[in-house]
Design a protein with these regions (language model features):
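Short beta-strands and strand-coil junctions in structured, solvent-facing domains, enriched
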Residues: 271-273, 293
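Alpha-helical protein-protein interaction elements
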Residues: 128, 213, 242-246, 276, ...
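Generic structural signal of hydrophobic/aromatic residues within well-ordered alpha-helices
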Residues: 84, 96, 200, 321-325, ...
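Short, gly/Ser/Thr-rich active-site loops of penicillin-recognizing serine hydrolases
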Residues: 178-180, 184, 278-331
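Beta-lactam-recognizing serine transpeptidase/beta-lactamase-like catalytic domain environment
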Residues: 1-18, 23-267
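A short, polar/proline- and glycine-enriched secondary-structure boundary/capping micro-motif
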Residues: 190-193, 273-277
Length: 332
C-alpha cells in the first residue's frame, strides 16, 4: 500500500525552473523595458554571465540567434530571459525583486495545511546573493516556490490579474442546511497593468500553439501556459551529486479566451532526458481534455434515433414480401 506522507503541492519547496520565466518577463514588461517584439541576440546559445556560462537547451545546435521576446518564451531561451533581466536590473537587483513582490508571488497564502511551506526569494542584501544570482534567478533557480504558489500566480493571469486565495471548501452543510460559508479571499486585486496582462496572455498562448509546449495543447480548445525543466539541487552536494535529477513541469490554463481551469503538472525525473513540454505537457493535455469533456452537453432535440432516419425506397421485388419485412421492422 502506498500513500503520500505529505502534500507535495503545498509543502515541497522547489526551484521552479522555466515556469518562473513568465514572472521575470512580466516584471520587465510592467517596467516598460521591453515589449513582446523586443529583440535579443542569444548568439550561439552560450553566453558568459559574470564568470559562469548560461546555456540554452539547443546550444550544441548553434542556438537561436536574434529572436524577439515572444519567441524567447516559445523556445524557453535561458540566454534570452537572463540577458534581459541582467541588462535592465543588473545595477539595481532590488528593483527586480520589488517587481516580483508587487505581483504577490511570494505572499504567504496561509492555507492551513500541516507542513505548508512559503516561497523563498533571495534578496540582494542577503549573504549568498552574488552577481550570478540575478540572471539565474530570472530563469527559475536560486528561488524556492511550492507548486501551489506557482499555480496561483498563473491562475491570477487567467483571472484577469486578480489573485485569489485557493479555496478547497465552498461551504459546510448539515442536514441540507448550510451552516458555514467560505467567501473568496483576494490576495492581490491587480498583479499588473491591463497592458502587461494582455501581452503576457498573448505570449503564453503562443508558447503552446507554436512553441515547445505544443504537447500541452488540444484540438478541442485553446491552452495557455509555460513549460519548465529544472535540475534538482541536492543541497550542499550540488546539482550533479548521485547523477543529474530533473523536475519537469507545465503550468497553464484553459480555454485561453475564457479561462475556466488552471492546472500545474510537476514530475521528478531521476535521470534524463527530461522535457517539460513533452512529459509534463502531455499529462496536462490529457487532464485538461478529460475535465473539458465532462462539461460537454448534446442538445436532445438534435439527437436522432433509428426511427428518425430517412428510409430509402424499396427496390423492385415481391410487394407482399417487402410489406411483411417492413411491418416487422415497424416501418410504415
Amino acid at each position: 500500500n502506498y500513500y503520500e506522507m505529505r502534500n507535495i503541492a503545498v509543502s515541497n519547496l522547489m526551484e521552479p525552473g522555466s515556469t518562473f520565466k513568465t514572472a521575470s518577463i512580466m516584471v520587465a514588461l510592467e517596467d516598460k523595458f521591453i515589449t513582446p517584439d523586443y529583440m535579443v541576440d542569444t548568439g550561439n546559445g552560450v553566453v558568459n554571465m559574470h564568470g559562469s556560462n548560461m546555456k540554452d537547451w539547443n546550444w550544441y545546435k548553434g542556438g537561436y540567434g536574434k529572436i524577439d521576446v515572444t519567441r524567447i518564451m516559445e523556445v524557453s531561451s535561458n540566454v534570452g530571459v537572463s540577458s534581459i533581466i541582467d541588462k535592465f536590473y543588473g545595477d539595481n537587483p532590488q528593483k527586480f525583486i520589488d517587481g516580483l513582490k508587487r505581483m504577490s508571488i511570494d505572499k504567504p497564502l496561509n492555507l492551513g495545511f500541516v507542513g505548508e511551506a512559503s516561497p523563498r526569494i533571495l534578496g540582494p542584501k542577503e549573504r549568498y546573493f552574488a552577481k550570478t544570482s540575478l540572471p539565474w534567478m530570472s530563469i527559475g533557480y536560486e528561488t524556492m516556490i511550492p507548486p501551489i504558489y506557482m499555480l496561483n500566480f498563473y491562475n491570477a493571469i487567467a483571472n484577469n490579474g486578480v489573485m485569489v486565495k485557493p479555496k478547497f471548501v465552498k461551504a459546510i452543510a448539515k442536514d441540507g442546511e448550510i451552516i458555514q460559508e467560505f467567501p473568496t479571499e483576494i490576495v492581490n486585486p491587480k498583479i499588473c497593468s491591463d497592458t502587461t496582462l494582455t501581452m503576457i496572455q498573448g505570449i503564453l498562448r503562443k508558447v503552446v500553439s507554436q512553441g515547445l509546449a505544443k504537447p500541452a495543447g488540444s484540438k478541442q480548445f485553446s491552452v495557455s501556459g509555460k513549460t519548465g525543466t529544472a535540475q534538482v539541487s541536492q543541497g550542499k552536494a550540488g546539482y550533479k551529486a548521485g547523477g543529474v535529477s530533473y523536475l519537469v513541469s507545465f503550468c497553464g490554463y484553459f480555454p485561453s479566451e475564457a479561462p475556466k481551469y488552471s492546472c500545474m503538472v510537476s514530475i521528478q525525473i531521476p535521470h534524463g532526458p527530461a522535457s517539460g513540454g513533452l512529459q509534463a505537457g502531455s499529462v496536462f493535455s490529457r487532464i485538461a481534455e478529460r475535465i473539458y469533456a465532462k462539461h460537454l452537453y448534446q442538445d436532445l432535440a438534435s439527437a436522432k434515433d433509428s426511427t428518425s432516419i430517412i428510409i430509402p425506397e424499396v427496390k423492385n421485388g415481391d410487394l407482399r414480401e417487402a410489406s411483411y419485412v417492413l411491418q416487422n421492422l415497424n416501418i410504415q
